[in-house]
Amino acid sequence: MRRSFYSWLMTQRNPKSNEPVAILADYAFDESDFPKQSDNFDEVSRFLEESASFAFSMSDFDAIWEDYLGH
């Protein structure tokens, strides 16, 4: 079974970075309702679009998801 997107994303945290993946990781870390156990693109994407308390570029998310799938 693939590790959750959130678990992988937390390995990308870097508060000093301006890279989109590091920014999303910091946002997700602070978001209590982030789907932490999910490895499903639709579930995470829907959360970001509809429920997140922050705004994030979905095109950046798509690229980050591709990186996640590659690991």
Curated annotation (Swiss-Prot):
InterPro entries: UPF0346 (IPR010673), YozE_SAM-like (IPR023089), YozE_SAM-like_sf (IPR036806). Transmembrane segments: none annotated. Pfam families: YozE_SAM_like. SUPFAM superfamilies: YozE-like. It comes from the Bacteria. HAMAP family: UPF0346. Belongs to the UPF0346 family. This is UPF0346 protein SSU05_1322. It comes from Streptococcus suis (strain 05ZYH33).
